[in-house]
Amino acid sequence: MSAQNNLKQWEDHITGEFVTKDVEQSLATMVEDASVMHMPTRSGGKGKAELRAYYRDMFIPSIPAEWQHTMTNRIVTENTIVEEAKARLHHTKQMEWFLPGVPPTNKWIDVELVIVIEFRDGKMATERIYWDQAAVLRQIGKL
């Protein structure tokens, strides 16, 4: 598929996660055996059934109301998107996918992300999200 199609799939996916908070909207952008992995915490899943539960029960409900995501660089090809972004969030909710076992600290966290998305048949096949967990832990006083 085209780079333009891949970008549209990615934008629809993150809109489902962060704007409309619609699990099915995000899943519609993915192949049946898609995988998602937040690498520092090994949180995510494989296959739409597992990802549906992950997004519904863990990821989407834990996104704080005060979450800002700013894309700083993006490379889009026919097979892959690599995105660099900055996130700023107010840690007011339990976020097992981001800070496992850490109750809300009410602190602001700034984190740089690298997201790698691979596509197959015009849909997202893999999504890997990387960040510096030590930098996050320092900001909340855990390191």
Regions found by a protein language model. Name each.
Residues 1-143:
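C-terminal and inter-domain tail/linker signature
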